[in-house]
């Protein structure tokens, strides 16, 4: 299991090839699951959310996490600490273009990154049980 966050993003502003950390990717190789905080791409500065670029670029997008999970060869990807939260009308002072998101929106974003494994959209206090090998 690899648990990742955003503090290790290699580059927090463009140009960058990915919003994820090389360190997390290295640790993820051969893991069963990645558990990582995620922001939905709809909050990006090229959208109409109003979220300042420096805040957006500190996060890892669900689509980049999907790509990382594919490259690492993991079976499961759990997205946590979601920005914006599922069903929220706003993320703090910022709007959510297109309205509140569903868990399927986060799953689709990870799939857009190329991941075809199991995607779990975590909610607060979620628990997870992996099958025994």
Task: Label each PLM-derived region with a short phrase.
Residues 1-3, 121:
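Residue-level marker for buried hydrophobic side chains located in beta-strands
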Residues 8-123:
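Cap/insert and terminal regions of metallo-dependent hydrolase folds
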Residues 121-133:
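C-terminal regions of proteins
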């Amino acid at each position: 299991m690899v648990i990742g966050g955003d503090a290790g993003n290699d580059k927090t502003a463009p140009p960058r090839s990915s919003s994820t950390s090389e360190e997390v990717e290295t640790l993820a190789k051969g893991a069963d699951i990645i558990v990582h905080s995620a922001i939905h791409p709809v909050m990006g500065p090229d959208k109409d959310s109003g979220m300042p670029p420096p805040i957006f670029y500190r996060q890892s997008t669900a689509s980049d996490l999907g790509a990382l999970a594919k490259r690492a060869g993991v079976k499961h990807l759990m997205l946590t600490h979601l920005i914006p939260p599922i069903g929220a009308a706003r993320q703090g002072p910022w709007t959510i273009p297109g309205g509140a998101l569903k868990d399927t929106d986060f799953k689709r974003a990870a799939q857009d990154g190329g991941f075809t494994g199991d995607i779990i959209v975590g909610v607060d206090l979620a628990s997870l049980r992996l099958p025994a090998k």
